Each structure stands twice: as C-alpha cells, then as structure tokens.
C-alpha cells in the first residue's frame, strides 16, 4: 500500500482518471443492464404471464402490417368454450390521455378500457377495503399513485371526477383503488373503466385487443388451429396466432401508449459488456504502466528476501482495493445520475439499487472478478520480467512489452470506432426523420385539439383565425399525419372488388393547409359538403376500378353500409401517412369529407390545423391563437403544438435508444482517451533519455511530438479495419426497424475515423508535450 500512496502522490491526475474511467464503465454496465432487465421483465407483473397470449389474425387487407390485433368484442363468443382456454379478456387498443377535473383543478390521466373480468385475469390488486374481495371490475377505478395526486389524503371512494370525453364533460364516480403496476406493464396507472358491454352486438367497432390464458403453454399451436377453424371456416388463407404477452408491447402492432420500439436485448447486453471490457482494458493498461516504475524496487526487495508470491499478493491486494474504490465511485455516479431529471430521460423505468438487488449483486461480483483477473495478470506479468532487462532499463522497449500494450489499446480503439460509426448512422437517421420529404409541408404548422365549448363554434372560430394577419390557411381534421401507424380503417365490398383503406376525415381546406399536391382531378371545395373522397396514388393504382368523378361504390357490390357513397373528386400524391416504421407508399388511403348521411358518426374533425405565413414568428402566432380560443368563454385549456416538433413524440423510444448509444459512445471514447493518456505516460517515462539525446542532437519539439503521435497511426488503422464491418453490421441491423431510412453513406466511415483519431492524437500531444519541452539536461541527470 505504501507504493500505491507514493504513486497516487506522484501521478494524481493519471490515478484519478484511471479510477474515474473504471467507475464510469461499471456505472454504464449497470445502467444498460437495467434497461435489458426492464425489457426482459415487461408484463411479468401480470398474473400468469407465462400462459397469457394476445390473439392476432393474418391481415389480407391494405393495412401496413401483415397481422391485425383489433377485434370487435363480439368475437369473444366464438372462443369462450374452446379447449385449453382457461380465460379470455379484452383491452382497448388505444390507451387514451384524458383531461379530468376535480375541485377546479385539471389533471391528465391515462384512460384504459378493460374487460369485466380484468381483476382475475390481469391480477389487479385492489386496496384493502370492501372492494378487495370482488371479482368483477367496477366501472371506474383509480391507481394509488393517481389517487394520491388528485385527492391527497382524502378517501377517493365515492368521489366524482369530471372527464372530457367525446366533446363533453361528464361525471364519473370512483368505485375502487388498485395497487400501482410497474412502468413496464401494459396495464397503465391511471383511470381504468369497464366499457365493453356498450359494444356487445356491434361488429363494426374494431377496437379491442383480445387476450387468452391457456391451461398449458404447450397447447399454443393447437389453440391457434382451433381459433382459426372456429372463425375462418371457409378460408384457407386467413389464420390466427398467439403472441406471448411479454412480447406484445414491443410489437409494431401495439397501439397502447407504451413502448412501440424495443432495442435488441442482445445489443443492450453487448453494449453493457463492452463498457465493462473497455474499463478492464484501461485498468489493466494502467496497472502495466505502473510496472516499469516499480521494477527496481521489486528487485531490491527480492534481494532483501521477499518472495515472488508475496510481491504478487501485494499487487493483487492493491488492485482489488482500487476496484473497490471504483465500485464506490460507480455507486456515487449512479446516485447522481438518478437525481438528475435530464439524465433520467436517458433511461426507462427505475434504476435504484433496492429494486435491482440481483443486478447489483451481479455487477459487484463481476467487477470484483474482473478486477482480480486484471490484478493477477498484471502481477504475474510484472514479476516475470527478467531482472537483466530491468537493470538495463530496456524493458519498456522490449518487443513483448510493446506488443502487449498496443494490443490492449487497439482493442479499446475497435470499440470506440464501432460505437462512433453506430452513433453516426443513428444521427443520420434522426436527420432523415426530421428532414425527409413527407409529401406535405410540416413546417410552420400549428395544431390543437378543439375545446368542447368550441365544437359548435367551428365556423366562427375558423373565420376569426383566418382574419389573423399571420395565418395563411386553416382547416379541421380528425388525425395528425405521420405521427401514428394506425388510423380509421374501412373495408368495403366483396370478391375481386373488395377495397380496404385508411380513411382520414378532413374538411375542404385540409389539403391546401398541409400543402398536399393533387395529381389528378381537383382539390376539395365548399360544394363537397355532401361528401367526397380524394384518394392517394397508391389507392388509385391498387383499385383501378375506382374512377374520378364517380361514386366510390359504383363498381362495388356489397358496400356493407348505407352511407359514404360519395364521388371521388381527386387523386393526390403519396404522403407519409404512418411513421417511418412502415412504407407509406404501399398503404391505400383516402381523405373523406363526411356528408349529412354520416351525422350519426359524430363530428370527428376535432383538431384544428393552422399554417403560418412566411416571415411571422411561430411562437408569437402560437400565443395569439391560444388567446383567441380563450375568448370563446371556454374553461378548458387549449395548447397549440408545432407539427414538426411532434415527431419527437412519435419516435420517442427510438430517440431514447439513440441517446443511450451516443452516451455510451462518448463514455467509451473518454475511457479510451484515459488509456491513451496512461500509455503515453508509460512511453514517456521510458524514453526520457532518448528524447533528451534527440533534442541535444537537434530535434525540435515538433519532431518529438510527431514521433510519439506517429506511433498511433498503425494501431488506429488496424482498429478501424476491424471496427468498420462491425459498425456496419450493427447499424444495418438497427436500420431494419425502419421501412424508410437513411443509407449508410460512405463518408460516415472516414468521419468516424477522423473523430476518434483526432481526439487520440490531441491527447498524445498534450501528454507527451511535457517531456518534449523539458530541459534535456535534467532528463539525462535523472536517468
């Protein structure tokens, strides 16, 4: 330990950086493993999750996916008595966010529909009161956390909330409180309602996900066959399948407000292990860097009677102590990370040690194990060097010593290059998402959900908005283009003339407001109030029997409904209807103005879109629009949002993973630089005399710095050659999550090389500059 204290006093910065690097590597390992654990344990809090499955059916329609997950609730009657199905329940496919009011205060809540048997099926645990023994789901229940946020210490049972739904406020009475579910669960914490009985007998309301619990997972295949035979008796093409509930939330089909994107658990685990390996490389390199400095004292102690075993034991104990200090540092970093809201935005779920006891133990044991292995290797290596080399002072230049140091550092370079390239590709995809041609102009567009009080004043509201000097155009619509993967779906007709498409309800000015180009025919006009369609080019090509200026159902038998027989007035160019997870160019879609015959469907155009003219400030426009809404004497708040900025929400999970990879790449490069710093320290200690002689013989400081920096060229090139295909493969794999994505440009590779190489060379120059500028006489004296 005396030597350790001596070394710390002499090389304070290098020692502290070494400990910081290992601490950061351990903390990074722990954080990424919490994310893997978060994904792996998704829905494991649900009752009998190992035997619970979601029902999906093959989609022969024009949906952008091959499988469909939404059904009318009536379909349950086909399956209730099938063999091997113990229970069957439903969940609304759209978890909503609703505004609720209590004592004049407004709150945003998750709002979820569940089947009447949800308590027994999902394992919902009611609070300890009279409701705890019931088996049927009450009509409205609140989670504990939500109840505390609204009611505080009051008893919520029997209290009335006012929720805004379907353009009106209505009271709901809280009938129970359930215990909170973990964040990684399909059952969200908020307001749960039982509503499926409203849709019994209604085969047109396709909004429910159906879940079944089997008596044994081994019967999955036979149940899939039974589901298909019980429903598709005359079809050999369509079928059902069962998806484990653990995987359901990460499916692209899932429409609840949880994650829709799941980074590969293997990738997350690899990243966490790489973090630990980079820390190990750095720690080992630092231990080896100390070896030449303690060689002479070790030989002296051997002469005085110390055994090789005792010297090795001392070095091992020193390294174990340093590992323990690094563990404490990692724990401190994680606690600091946990206290920072900005940092916590980089992770999902809870990262506290008490909720990850097993992972904490694994991290502790793994780190200590790695520390011991590193210590054993360093101790064996340092004590196995022939004494003659040490006495001559030539160990630092021996081929074996140089090769080992460069191999370790090259391994760090490989990881740094691969992750930098990976991060660059992700950055390219982020740029592509924000800057691709969407087929509509998303810039300078504000939108808002219309308050209930304004629904019946839409004409007046539009008139007043149009009068504002900064408004170029405005319109009402039901949906926001490009921010979802599923919209209202219509299927009409039969046989060869069956059509299926995404139906988007709009008003006559929507295409003009969104700057969507008409390819054939005309745009909507005020005379289309009785109903009209504008198809996208994909729908026009897919269903060629649909003709311009003719009713859409002219050549279609069995339209199935008495309404919607409107003419097709135009064909517009394709636009990005869904997110980039799907190829919008393959999805038939139609804008529709709903006529008086569809009045029973209600007014679906509840969002207002406003295009701001060039030269006007968007923030000031937003402020004035919100003030205008307030003048309608509505108690509800109305917040306008920027359409282009809402992409951040659409790709929230992808952007989270991108941020995590960038964070890892930064830490990886930082730890690698610590390794470079230590190796340069090692080199300069053993080449002091050589540098002094070179300077006496006329070498300049520039030439000495070039001598040190030039030695890194071959390891950097070798590492890049190894890292480039690795980075390309993992980047290609990640891009497969998007149907539309950026290419991997050739210049990503030299850019990654330049980024890492530049910071490495700068580190070498800064560290070796101290020796290069030192008086050569002093170096010769000390050597």
What are these regions (language model features)?
Residues 263-286, 658-678, 722, 726, ...:
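Internal alpha-helical transmembrane segments of multipass membrane proteins
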Residues 27, 31, 241, 320-387, ...:
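Small-residue-rich transmembrane alpha-helices
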Residues 115-127, 138-260, 463-649:
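Mid-to-C-terminal secondary-structure elements
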Residues 635-716, 720, 731:
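C-terminal transmembrane helical bundles of large multi-pass transporters
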Residues 32-97, 199-200, 205-213, 222-226, ...:
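Membrane-proximal extracellular/periplasmic loop immediately following the first transmembrane helix
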Residues 6, 10-11, 46, 228-272, ...:
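Membrane-helix entry/capping segments
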Residues 10-40, 50, 405-429, 440, ...:
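Short, strongly hydrophobic transmembrane alpha-helices
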Residues 3-13, 17, 21, 279-322, ...:
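Intracellular coupling helices
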